[in-house]
Amino acid sequence: MKLAHWMYAGPAHIGTLRVASSFKNVHAIMHAPLGDDYFNVMRSMLERERNFTPATASIVDRHVLARGSRKRVVDHIIRKDKEEGPDLIILTPTCTSSILQEDLKNFVDRASIISDCNVIFADVDHYQVNEIQAADRTLEQVVRYYLEKSHTLDQFVTDAPSVNIIGILTLGFHNRHDCRELRRLLKDLDIRINQIIPEGGSVEDPKNLPKARFNLIPYREVGLMTAMYLNKEFGMPYVSTTPMGAVDMAECIRQIKKSLETLAAPILSSKRVDYESYIDGQTRFVSQAAWFSRSIDCQNFTGKETVVFGDATHAASITKILAREMGIRVSCTGTYCKHDAEWFKEQIKDFCDEIIITDDHAEVGDIISRVEPSAIFGTQMERHIGKRLEIPCGVISAPAHIQNFSLGYRPFLGYEGTNQIADLVYNSFALGMEDHLLDIFCGHDTKEIMTKSLSTDISPIWDPESRQELGKIPRFVRDEVKRNTEKFARRKGILNVTVEVMHAAKEALS
């Protein structure tokens, strides 16, 4: 457990609740004190759904601490079974209530005897894992539970090419838009979708998962454990290459073709798809990003530096797109997914100057302040950091705020996703001449000059004459001049920045 003002990944019970509320007709009960039950409000605000979030709290209060939780938890499960009639109830403690060390598994076993629905206890170590790891583990636990419960399974694969999409879930970054784009891609490839879990799926669906010819895991964060379990138990191949960016899109499609050819069962399809021709046609004529990367607009990015930070999937993919497809220098790339650090480093080692693995936002902020990139691509926290440093930021990963749960169609995966990413990259960079013209003609950019830095060091104080002189400098280089002057002043031990200090700093740099 960790006390922090900001966490990139929430506590473990949030991951369990995300999986539970993604399935249809599944109810989650969290054994928690008041204050830990904010998931309902958060999901209702961000997802903007009509339906209520199917999660309630069995509150730990002074009465529970005095007499124990068994009666309250069991009664809560039975009451929700009668009121809601769910197919499954998942009970999870929170990191706070886990301190009590109660045998909740025993409570679940007792409630299972009385209730009509299935009841399981989320088997997650709340002291060791975060939201992402817990979501991955909970999904695998639900799939395993229903497959083992079925006893006799129809393991005959479909005659036509078919796939399971695993890992689309509520509060995921643009997950629903990505799911629509994956549907379009698979339809073009004449591949039938067998199941999509957990988002919108039923808990009765997992027993049909082995009928598909392969599994597609669009994000490493959630779904990989389930795919590995299905591969071990049923020999199902899986594709875990994220179809983000033109190059990885092509690689993902080639892996899909390879996976379909793995099984000995013959494929009966209404049409034969030429995968290489499809890749060529989509890359050249459907995706606008391919020609845009060779245009004069994209060439203007030459020499620009960026910093990328996010979950392992999005940070790695965006880094490769920037460096390999758009020719933009990535000074530093990082992720807060410490558990996937080895894979992350292997993916982006040839595409950036520096790699950082951390869940400390202050450390990320210090790196951004040191590198002084032209643009940042990160989470909501990097957006806040960028605002403080007056560096533009494009949000490419969770955690994100409500503006990144758009009502419009904005996928990151697939060929339409390449267009969205190209737009995001282009619009995230500050165009120097545009800012300069806005300054000259008193455009919308009329805010005061920012003289505070992100660093906790004492910043030199600018006198009125030096502020006025700084205001005469074109805005697209003003921040750089300000930072270089302050660095010079700190190095020389100067506390007050004057016009003379500005000129001295300029001479020292030239």
Swiss-Prot record:
Active site (catalytic residues): D297 (proton donor)
Catalytic activity, reaction form: chlorophyllide a + oxidized 2[4Fe-4S]-[ferredoxin] + 2 ADP + 2 phosphate = protochlorophyllide a + reduced 2[4Fe-4S]-[ferredoxin] + 2 ATP + 2 H2O
Functional note: Component of the dark-operative protochlorophyllide reductase (DPOR) that uses Mg-ATP and reduced ferredoxin to reduce ring D of protochlorophyllide (Pchlide) to form chlorophyllide a (Chlide). This reaction is light-independent. The NB-protein (ChlN-ChlB) is the catalytic component of the complex.
Main location: plastid
One Pfam family per UniProt: Oxidored_nitro
Subunit structure: Protochlorophyllide reductase is composed of three subunits; ChlL, ChlN and ChlB. Forms a heterotetramer of two ChlB and two ChlN subunits.
Gene name for this UniProt entry: chlB
Listed GO MF terms: 4 iron, 4 sulfur cluster binding; ATP binding; metal ion binding; oxidoreductase activity, acting on iron-sulfur proteins as donors; oxidoreductase activity, acting on the CH-CH group of donors, iron-sulfur protein as acceptor
Pathway(s) annotated for this protein in UniProt: Porphyrin-containing compound metabolism; chlorophyll biosynthesis (light-independent)
Subcellular compartments: Plastid, Chloroplast
Domain of life: Eukaryota
Protein's organism: Pinus thunbergii (Japanese black pine)
Cofactor note: Binds 1 [4Fe-4S] cluster per heterodimer. The cluster is bound at the heterodimer interface by residues from both subunits.
Class in the EC hierarchy, top level: oxidoreductase
Any single GO BP term: light-independent chlorophyll biosynthetic process
Names of required cofactors: [4Fe-4S] cluster
EC numbers: 1.3.7.7
HAMAP family: ChlB_BchB
Keywords: 4Fe-4S, ATP-binding, Chlorophyll biosynthesis, Chloroplast, Iron, Iron-sulfur, Metal-binding, Nucleotide-binding, Oxidoreductase, Photosynthesis, Plastid
Name of protein: Light-independent protochlorophyllide reductase subunit B
Annotated binding of [4Fe-4S] cluster, by residue: D36
Entries under NCBIfam families matching the protein: DPOR_BchB (TIGR01278)
A GO CC term assigned to this protein in UniProt: chloroplast
